[in-house]
């Protein structure tokens, strides 16, 4: 995982994977702090533990008549136009590029014909901060300030 060493510990997920199933259906997309070597095995999505479903790098699922679309990853202008070239064990910068969203994942979703009820992404939509208290947000998370200013 591409995180500081203090976060490289097995935490709650192992509990749900091995011992205690999640009590409700949990659907997620990948971001920049997931174990991408594990999620790569589920490129198209799939069950990662009992009652926990990974939506894949991009995809649409139907849950009780509700259509949910999602895209994993974070935006990187350097990898946006590339394909997925990373292989495990990750070498060099691959540990970071593995979780970058690719343009073709968005293009695949744009081909979906039927309406989508819910869209899930890891990255915030542009200008979402216009609908929040930016002062409080940047006081709690100062590193967001630059992202907000740059859209």
Over which residues does each language-model region extend?
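Core catalytic region of metal-dependent phosphoesterases/phosphodiesterases
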Residues: 1-63
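Active-site-proximal loop/helix segment associated with metal-binding centers of metalloenzymes
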Residues: 8, 50, 64-150
């Amino acid at each position: 995982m591409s995180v500081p060493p203090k976060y490289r510990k097995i935490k709650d997920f192992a509990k749900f994977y091995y011992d205690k199933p999640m009590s409700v259906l949990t659907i997620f997309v990948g971001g920049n702090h997931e174990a991408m070597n594990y999620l790569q095995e589920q490129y198209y999505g799939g069950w990662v533990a009992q009652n926990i479903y990974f939506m894949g790098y991009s995809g649409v699922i139907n849950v009780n008549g509700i259509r949910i679309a999602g895209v994993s990853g974070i935006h990187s202008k350097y990898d946006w136009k590339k394909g997925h070239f990373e292989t495990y064990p990750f070498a060099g910068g691959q540990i970071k590029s593995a979780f970058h969203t690719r343009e073709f994942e968005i293009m695949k979703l744009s081909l979906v014909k039927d309406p989508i009820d819910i869209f899930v992404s890891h990255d915030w939509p542009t200008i979402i901060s216009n609908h929040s208290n930016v002062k409080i947000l940047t006081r709690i998370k100062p590193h967001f300030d630059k992202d907000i200013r740059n859209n």
